[in-house]
Amino acid sequence: MFIKYAEVLNLVKNILKSMVGEALIGSGPEVAHIDLVIGPRGGSVEAAFMNSLAMPRQGHTPLLAVLEPNIQPKPTTLIVNKVTIKNVSQAALMFGPAQAAVAKAVMDSVADGVLPEEQADDIFIIVSVFIEWDAKDKDKVYEFNYEATKLAIARAMEGRPTVEEALAKKDSANHPFA
């Protein structure tokens, strides 16, 4: 089904262009739906990263992924929220379990060889995170966002789905929220 991590290294030794990944993991109000972009220093992802970080707006505050305060993952990763943050409990899930889960998924992707360690200082990642207003279980938020981020990174690096895979599903696709 998916290319093994070691094979990814043979396919992509250098990240020279922007790549896109997506993953949906979990269920209920803690469901994680991750969209992300990965790109090289000097590219459009870096420009979007800097612009987003410099221009927060009410209910949408970009934040750096951190393993813990003062420890960012490498590649440097920016988290943006898909849903307007309306209350303190929703903010606490974003600025806590989701933030840490994304950072851990990025570092595990480097450790697993999915993201090239030798380029970690020259890659930027933007991760769009969904935290539903009714989400409450911080452990599920962490688990689902960790798994979804890892899967989205792998899909981006593998170029998945391929055009052929998307064409094969176009008439039978079943979106869980449609």
From Swiss-Prot:
Cell location: Cytoplasm
Active site, renumbered: H33
Any one GO molecular-function label of the UniProt entry: carbon-nitrogen lyase activity
Catalytic activity: 5,6,7,8-tetrahydromethanopterin + formaldehyde = 5,10-methylenetetrahydromethanopterin + H2O
Any one GO biological process: carbohydrate biosynthetic process
Binding site for substrate: D35, L64, K82, T84, Q99
Summary of the function given for this chain in its UniProt record: Catalyzes the condensation of formaldehyde with tetrahydromethanopterin (H(4)MPT) to 5,10-methylenetetrahydromethanopterin.
Family the UniProt entry places it in: Belongs to the formaldehyde-activating enzyme family.
Record protein name field: 5,6,7,8-tetrahydromethanopterin hydro-lyase
Originating organism: Methanosarcina barkeri (strain Fusaro / DSM 804)
